[in-house]
């Protein structure tokens, strides 16, 4: 494994242990490319998690976009000089960013479409702003772009061209993964004033945006504040129940489709094996997920992923 790929693997180990552990079940020759893919996704998602000013976030996203395009262009020029290095050497921009370097190698080695990586950058722009997610369809499109795309790319690394069934599996799995991430990150997005629960779902259930965006505060009598607090709690329960129902719908469809795929694709989906454990916590906590992080130990993640890897039980 090249130095840049090793860097990506260690990045996964520190930020997203389930991704790191899942990569270890892939064939050794494919691990570096998978680590690079996941590391790129993490870096893109990390921008919305850390940046408070949208303009700064836009600049960082544009940097990743431009750096990847420049690396691919320079690598093609380099390949014209030394054709035999097209899949085995690191690109010229390796010294600038190891994630860009490793992703460039993966794109060239496995003929991955660069547009898919740019799709990640474009979809992540929503994370920079405080606009409410407009509809369930928009949320599913967002999740497919940020998570389903990565699953599709992982499948291409593992097995070459993907079938319609594999694409369907990736779509449902990506939406389920995105919805679980939505719930897991609620304490942070709540602090940032961001709302990912779709406006049309909220409206259909009589939940107003302010019930999700604000906590109870003010100079009202204690009795009135308590009443408002109880109303907000009930509305948040309704909102979370809607997202949980949507998750179960997509995760069930994912499992049904995944069982029909060749075993060689399985490592791509192993990170999803930990999702039910997070969702069970969310179902117990209900509205508390807005303020309390959902945490699963690395050992439990290992157990869930290992069971899926050996027995195909998600």
Question: How would you label these PLM feature ranges?
Answer:
Residues 82:
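Catalytic cores of transferase enzymes with a strong primary signal for eukaryotic protein kinases
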